[in-house]
Curated annotation (Swiss-Prot):
InterPro entries: bL21-like, bL21-like_sf, Ribosomal_bL21, Ribosomal_bL21_CS. The keyword RNA-binding applies. Part of the 50S ribosomal subunit. Contacts protein L20. This is Large ribosomal subunit protein bL21. One of its GO terms (biological process) is translation. Belongs to the bacterial ribosomal protein bL21 family. This protein binds to 23S rRNA in the presence of protein L20. It comes from the Bacteria. Keywords: Ribonucleoprotein, Ribosomal protein, RNA-binding, rRNA-binding.
Length: 105
Protein backbone atom coordinates (compact mmCIF):
# COMPACT_ATOMS: atom_id res chain seq x y z
CA UNK A 1 0.00 0.00 0.00
CA UNK A 2 1.26 3.48 -0.82
CA UNK A 3 -0.07 7.02 -0.87
CA UNK A 4 0.67 10.25 -2.69
CA UNK A 5 0.92 13.11 -0.18
CA UNK A 6 1.32 16.87 -0.53
CA UNK A 7 3.88 18.89 1.38
CA UNK A 8 5.41 22.26 0.55
CA UNK A 9 3.69 22.53 -2.82
CA UNK A 10 5.13 19.22 -4.00
CA UNK A 11 3.76 15.69 -4.17
CA UNK A 12 5.59 12.63 -2.86
CA UNK A 13 4.87 8.90 -3.26
CA UNK A 14 5.31 7.29 0.16
CA UNK A 15 4.87 3.90 1.80
CA UNK A 16 5.29 2.85 5.43
CA UNK A 17 8.98 2.95 6.37
CA UNK A 18 10.02 5.33 3.58
CA UNK A 19 12.29 8.28 4.33
CA UNK A 20 11.49 11.40 2.30
CA UNK A 21 12.90 14.95 2.22
CA UNK A 22 10.26 17.71 2.11
CA UNK A 23 10.36 21.49 2.34
CA UNK A 24 11.25 22.81 5.80
CA UNK A 25 8.60 22.09 8.44
CA UNK A 26 8.51 23.34 12.00
CA UNK A 27 9.02 20.60 14.55
CA UNK A 28 11.74 19.02 16.61
CA UNK A 29 13.25 15.63 15.72
CA UNK A 30 10.93 12.91 16.97
CA UNK A 31 7.77 15.00 16.51
CA UNK A 32 4.80 13.50 14.66
CA UNK A 33 3.52 15.12 11.46
CA UNK A 34 0.26 14.43 9.60
CA UNK A 35 0.37 14.70 5.81
CA UNK A 36 -2.72 15.13 3.59
CA UNK A 37 -3.24 12.23 1.18
CA UNK A 38 -4.09 12.98 -2.46
CA UNK A 39 -4.17 9.38 -3.69
CA UNK A 40 -4.22 5.97 -2.02
CA UNK A 41 -3.29 2.71 -3.74
CA UNK A 42 -4.19 -0.38 -1.71
CA UNK A 43 -3.45 -3.52 -3.69
CA UNK A 44 -5.89 -3.41 -6.60
CA UNK A 45 -8.04 -0.47 -5.48
CA UNK A 46 -7.13 3.15 -6.19
CA UNK A 47 -8.79 5.91 -4.15
CA UNK A 48 -8.68 9.51 -5.36
CA UNK A 49 -12.05 10.80 -4.16
CA UNK A 50 -11.63 13.71 -1.74
CA UNK A 51 -14.45 12.52 0.53
CA UNK A 52 -12.95 9.05 0.87
CA UNK A 53 -9.45 10.45 1.40
CA UNK A 54 -10.68 12.61 4.29
CA UNK A 55 -10.60 9.49 6.49
CA UNK A 56 -7.05 8.51 5.41
CA UNK A 57 -4.29 9.53 7.83
CA UNK A 58 -0.65 9.49 6.74
CA UNK A 59 1.62 9.99 9.75
CA UNK A 60 5.35 10.62 9.73
CA UNK A 61 8.09 11.28 12.25
CA UNK A 62 10.59 14.13 11.89
CA UNK A 63 14.08 12.63 11.63
CA UNK A 64 15.96 15.91 11.32
CA UNK A 65 16.86 18.90 9.15
CA UNK A 66 19.20 18.39 6.19
CA UNK A 67 20.52 20.63 3.43
CA UNK A 68 19.55 20.15 -0.19
CA UNK A 69 21.89 20.20 -3.18
CA UNK A 70 24.08 23.23 -3.86
CA UNK A 71 22.65 25.63 -6.43
CA UNK A 72 25.08 28.03 -8.09
CA UNK A 73 23.95 31.41 -9.41
CA UNK A 74 26.12 33.48 -11.73
CA UNK A 75 25.10 36.96 -12.87
CA UNK A 76 26.97 38.63 -15.70
CA UNK A 77 26.61 42.01 -17.36
CA UNK A 78 28.21 42.43 -20.75
CA UNK A 79 31.02 44.98 -21.37
CA UNK A 80 31.22 46.16 -17.74
CA UNK A 81 33.32 43.50 -16.07
CA UNK A 82 30.46 42.73 -13.67
CA UNK A 83 30.30 39.16 -12.38
CA UNK A 84 28.41 38.03 -9.30
CA UNK A 85 28.64 34.48 -8.04
CA UNK A 86 26.28 33.22 -5.39
CA UNK A 87 25.32 29.84 -3.97
CA UNK A 88 22.33 28.50 -2.08
CA UNK A 89 21.42 25.32 -0.20
CA UNK A 90 17.78 24.93 0.81
CA UNK A 91 16.99 23.46 4.23
CA UNK A 92 14.82 20.34 4.05
CA UNK A 93 13.03 18.29 6.69
CA UNK A 94 13.68 14.54 6.58
CA UNK A 95 10.57 12.52 7.46
CA UNK A 96 10.12 8.80 8.10
CA UNK A 97 6.62 7.56 7.29
CA UNK A 98 5.29 5.63 10.29
CA UNK A 99 1.78 4.75 9.17
CA UNK A 100 -0.95 4.94 6.55
CA UNK A 101 -4.31 4.44 8.21
CA UNK A 102 -7.53 4.08 6.26
CA UNK A 103 -10.90 4.79 7.81
CA UNK A 104 -12.07 1.24 7.10
CA UNK A 105 -12.92 -0.93 10.11
Amino acid sequence: MYAVVASGGKQHRVAVGDVVDVELLSGEPGAAVNLPALLLVDGESVTHDADALASVAVTAEVVGVVKGPKIRIHKFKNKTGYHKRQGHRQKLTRLKVTGIETGKA
